[in-house]
Amino acid sequence: MYRRVFVGAQLTLLGLLGSLLLGYTLPRAWRILNTDFPNYYLAARLVREGVDPSRAYDWIWLQREKDHRNIDQPVVGLVPITPFSTLVMWPIAGLPPLVAKHAWLVLNLALLFPIVWLMRSVSGLSLLQVGCLVGLCFPLHRNFLYGQYYVVLLGILTAALWAVQRQRNYLAGSLLALGVAVKIFPVILALHFVKKKNWAALIACLVTGLLCAVASISVFGWSLHRTYLLQVLPATLRGEALDPYNLSSSSLSSLLHRLFIFEPQLNAHPALHAPWLFAILHPALELTLLLPALMWIEDRASSATRTALEWSALLLATLTFTPLPASYHFTVLILPVAIICGYLVQERRSAPLMIVIALYLAVGYPGWNTAPVDGWRAFLHVKRLYALILLTTVALSLIRSRARVQQRIWWFAGAAAALTISIVSGLKHQHGLFDDYPYRLPMGQQMFLAAQPIPRGSEIQTIALLRNGYRRTTMGDDTVRFSSADGVNDELSLTVGGSQLWTEVVGARSIIESSFGPSILDAESPATLAGGNELAFLREIDGRKQLFVGGQQLTTPTSGWNLDEISISPNSSIVVAATKNRGESRLYTVRGVDQLELIPVGEARYPAISPDGRWLAFSTFQSGHWNLSLRNFSTLEVRRLTTVGCNQTQPAWLSDSKTLLYSSDCGRAQGFTAICKRRFLP
């Protein structure tokens, strides 16, 4: 009798949860694109259309491409997405955006059925019980609303565990490699293969990972992957791919950033400014969770139940210290929780089972107060982090076992080495990181980033990212004013010449509008010649940006050039940053049509010629960062102005030819720059 009532209650709950998904979440997801799906879709569509995607991690560059395709989403960005993860959108990238999302939603909904079936097998729960756990996962609803990837990842990881339990090691390794290619964090699960000496699975993982990399590079090119490996991935691991001080992520990284790192706009009142504490505590606390999960993995073949528990502990530890998780990340939490619940049901341990379910609901609960607060009060605003830590502790308690002392010594030695390297690397990264804080110009709190500074009289014109898109912004001594544009079209670049202000207004096409005078159609990234009477600009032809001065085209697509930025000297000589055949960006002097003469300063972008014509400021790329450099046109001497572990780009000279404006993301998220004003010459 009790069993029938219990099953009836489960059926009722599943019916209610299914109605919520099908009757509320899916209709909302069906009507609009929402935040994340356009990012994946756009990347796949660009390469499908033959556009060079090398700059896809540049926020403003990608926004322009989004606008040109009439994608109804205020802001897009590819950071911190892996290029490979967008490849699955290739078959549907030829569809209109909302139709493509419909296809994606149908695929995700269909995947839930085999996922539930496989999860029943790996966890020991009934189909009904697994269905209830899936329905109780609020992050799953967010995954559907935003068109995210985590249902696919959940399916991959569940299938990989199913294969491990049945000793189908090559299949398990290959599936895990797919999971890593989609979202980096499952790479920690490969340590399970190492601890078990499951070399077949590890080799399959490495080979499949290599094949995924080859496939991705063949589609997107090496340049985009180089940017990901050298810039995006390191920032992601530090928790700085997006706003690192935002407590809504409820991560260890965001908590420690909030407590110990000062930033003038984003975190003006930390508990104390002690970045060295972040460099030490972040890896140390991560290791505190990860090391037991590794140490207590048995080094011999285990039962299917034991293997599943080991995976759940390792996956939970990984999810707990993921740097900047959004709510939908925890769709993957269904797998480890199902495994733990299945084990506790079999052991008839009701109290721990109730605790696990309560913690599972707490992790997914959308109503936690994560508002920004100052100082030590930040500890009160990361409740999801505490629920994850407790859930991981439960999983660790279930796998605790006695490992041989010799093996423990080796693992401890490896952990100590990894911790030392991480701390030293973190401290090195912080060297000089905050040096340009005294030179920062005040930003409005509504500005997520400010870029492309241009002096105009006593004020500075810049492009700012606001909640509804990009707007030209005027920054005075104590004031910030936004352009009175219609609010529909983005404003993505600008220049000043004489009394004129030229702004690139972007909709289905880019139009350079003058403060007075005619506009220029299909033109972007303007730069004025001396006197401001003639304009140089870029125009996209066959997926690459080409240089125009007035009505004359100075580069052609057949030559392989793809231009990024333009600078013009007082005597009207032109210096550009450009790539050829998807190579590294270099600086060139334009001598004629398709005649670009290399300036030998290494990999460089963002040229800016001083008003007196003596100096060329630019950014050079070294050790994964863009830093400022200076070249004397007379002596040809080149010197580095800055050497820091962040990006300082888009220099612009003041009229004294000694002071630079530039964009800096030091102490901020990758590419989310602020404006600095700094004198470099005596």
Show which residues each predicted segment covers.
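Primarily membrane-embedded glycan-assembly and transfer machineries that use lipid-linked glycans
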Residues: 1-171, 196-327
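Membrane-embedded alpha-helical segments of multi-pass membrane proteins
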Residues: 106-111, 151-156, 179-185, 206, ...
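A cytosolic-side transmembrane-helix exit/cap motif
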Residues: 150-153, 173-176, 223-230, 333, ...
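Transmembrane helices and adjacent periplasmic/lumenal helix-loop junctions
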Residues: 174-193, 321-332
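Aromatic-enriched
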Residues: 339-430
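Sequence signature of WD/YWTD-type beta-propeller architectures
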Residues: 408-682
